[in-house]
């Protein structure tokens, strides 16, 4: 179920404040955030945001194609290490 249109898209207030301050100063630095549920706004384009994946912050460079999506969509939280090998298939006859 999607968010109500009367509420508008969600973005963490402090994150948006940092982005606007960076755009005004022209400074390009990585911003750390834990807010994976924040929506990517047009003001964030061409900035790098380090999104937390539960263990570390992963840097994500924001492009125009990402506008409207959530920050958490671009950082996977689980690492797939492969299926466990069956011991029967490892034995030679």
Curated annotation (Swiss-Prot):
One GO BP annotation of this record: ribosomal small subunit assembly
GO CC terms in record: cytoplasm; small ribosomal subunit
Gene3D superfamilies: 30s Ribosomal Protein S19, Chain A (3.30.860.10)
Domain of life according to the entry: Bacteria
Presence of the UniProt keyword Secreted in the record: no
UniProtKB keywords: Ribonucleoprotein, Ribosomal protein, RNA-binding, rRNA-binding
The keyword rRNA-binding is annotated on this UniProt entry: yes
GO molecular function: rRNA binding; structural constituent of ribosome
NCBIfam families the record matches: rpsS_bact
Family of this protein: Belongs to the universal ribosomal protein uS19 family.
Function: Protein S19 forms a complex with S13 that binds strongly to the 16S ribosomal RNA.
Record-given protein name: Small ribosomal subunit protein uS19
Taxonomic source organism: Clostridioides difficile (strain 630)
């Amino acid at each position: 179920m999607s968010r109500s249109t009367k509420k508008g898209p969600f973005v963490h207030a402090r994150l948006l404040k940092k982005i606007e301050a960076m755009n005004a100063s022209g400074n390009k630095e990585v911003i750390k955030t834990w807010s994976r549920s924040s929506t990517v706004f047009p003001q964030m384009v061409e900035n790098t945001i380090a999104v937390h994946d539960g263990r570390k912050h992963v840097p994500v460079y924001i492009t125009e194609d990402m506008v409207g999506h959530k920050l958490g969509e671009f950082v996977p939280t689980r690492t797939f290490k492969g299926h466990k090998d069956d011991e029967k298939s490892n034995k030679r006859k």
